[in-house]
Amino acid sequence: HRFAWYFQRAFSAMESGDELGYIRGLRLGLQAAPAMREMVDFLLEHKLKSAAQRELEELTEQVRCILAQCSPNDPAVAMLKQSEVYQKVFPLLFQQRMSASEPQTSESPVSPALLDEALAGTQEEIAASVWEHLARWGERSARSRVDYWETYPLWGSSKEAVVESLAAALSHHGADFRWLFDRLSDELSRRVLTAVVRGWRFFECAPLRGVRESRYDDYFDLDLFPRGRQEVLADLGAFTGDTFLSYVKNYGSLSYLRYYAYEITAESYQRLSQTTAPYPRVVLRRKGAGEGPGTMALHAGANKSANTLSKGETQSAETIETVALDDDIGEPLTFIKMDIEGAEQAALRGCSQHIRKERPKLALSVYHNFEDLWKLPRMIEELVPGYRFFLRYHGGDLWPTEITLLALPPKTE
């Protein structure tokens, strides 16, 4: 744990521009590596192989997560890989873990038992399990997760609330998660679902790294969404135009007939206007998407991309108009994208007529709470039975985020 902690400290120093702290952390980390090896040798010598394996497994998870956040050209990566403990111990353990618990390719079947294990237990048992696995990471690694929860309070207002909400979701909705597992349309999606749920309960980061999408941009999987013509898109949570530019990069500016972009934050909306100004047929709306017409209070998040709307108005909160897409867009839609910080369910209800009548392609963020992952597919299934569901993962290793549900309309006979 000291070994991994020193490297974590080094990379934190690097991010903050502390060059001296970066170098010192690397040096201390490498000095700790032989001590780690000596401890393992001692345990093996005393026939405590299970204990040695457990210690190594926890350490390996931490180091793999650290490496996943670094550039392959980072000198710290080269220094780490030159260390004796990395060269002699980690490769064998990596190989063992891959063969034991990780599918080798996206086509390899993932056992439903892995999902069932993460869903097993009462709410109290699951909560106790979550606290236990969080503590195994050590104080600093656990603190980094808690800090993330508190910075982005999407899953709860405190660490206790997050764990309680997670335990309730897994214990009360196991059948819904299993339904989704069976309804997903490819093996990669089932691997993503399993990795996410196990990441929630057991804080496993290696499976998340194994399913991270590296070929395609978020929302635009070219295997599932090949280039279309005369597309009419609604981008809910358009931010500064990053999704629009990604769409143009992947499909070209001649592929869309109209692009509707909705954004609630003034600063982001201004940048969105600048981003899209050179392009024709882009319609901007500084409105929130919801179930129906109304107004809501804008609340600032940790960054401009995480601002949210709520009904509880305050004197300092800006008021934003909300609309239903069914009312706000009068022409047929072929593609709807949503990344609106937990308001996806309301927005989906607000575009139900578009979905029923036109059966557009859907790209929906499903990581802003513990419910959307199964709830949004259930809602779509109720509107139009037979939609094909896929999950893609663009997030990090330490906590599951950037999970996208891609939904294709039912195949026509």
Residue ranges of each PLM-predicted region?
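Phosphate/nucleotide-binding beta-alpha loop and adjacent structural elements of enzyme active sites
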Residues: 9, 16-413
